[in-house]
Amino acid sequence: QRQMCIRDRDNRWQWFLSGLGYTLLISFFAVLVGLVIGVVMAFGRLSKNKLFRGISGLYIDIIRGTPTMVQLLIIYFIIFANVNIDRWMVGVIAFGINSGAYIAEIVRGGILSIDQGQTEAGRSLGLTQRQTMTYIIIPQAVKNILPALGNEFIVLIKETAVIGMIANIDLVGAARKVQSLTYDYVVPMLSIALIYYVVIKIVSTLLKACLLYTSPSPR
C-alpha cells in the first residue's frame, strides 16, 4: 500500500499533463464548433428572412442569458442522458454551442463595421449581393474580428474548468485527484492557477504575433 501511495505521488505530474491536454483539446474543438455555429447565426441575424433572423436572435439571447455550467448540465444529463458518448465530447458540444452565440455577435459586428459605401461600390461594379459580401465585405470583416476571436478562445480555455461538473478530466480534475491523495487543498489549486496563467500568456503572445503578421505593414 505504501508503494502504491508513492507511485501515485509520482504520477501527479502526469495527471496535470493529461488535464492540460484535455483542457486544450476541448477548447480547440469547441472554438471550431463555435465558429461554424457563430458564422451561421451571424448571417441569420443579418438575413432578410424573418424566421431565420428570429431563430438566430432567440438562440443568441438564450445562450448568452444562461450560465455555461447550466448549459453543460442540461446537455449532459438531459440531451445526452441515454447516449453513450465520451464526456470530453459533451464538453466540446456544450462549450461550442455557448461560444457560438458570442462568436455570432463578433462576426455580425465585424460585418456591420464595414462602411456601407463598400457594398454600394461593389454593386455599382455589377457584383451581386453575394459576390459583394464574398469578395469585398468578408475579407475586410475578418481582419476586424480576428482580435475578438482570439479573446474568445482565451475565455473558452478558462471556461472549460466547469467540465469538472461531469468529469474529472481537465486541470481542475487533476487538482482534485491530487487533493484526494495528499489532503492538501492549497498547492494543487495554486498549481493549476499557475498552469492556466502560463498557458493564457503563451496563447496571448502567439495570437498577438499572428495579428502582427497578418496586419499590413505601415509605410
Predicted features along the sequence, with ranges:
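Transmembrane alpha-helices and adjacent helix-loop boundaries
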Residues: Q3, R7-S215, R219
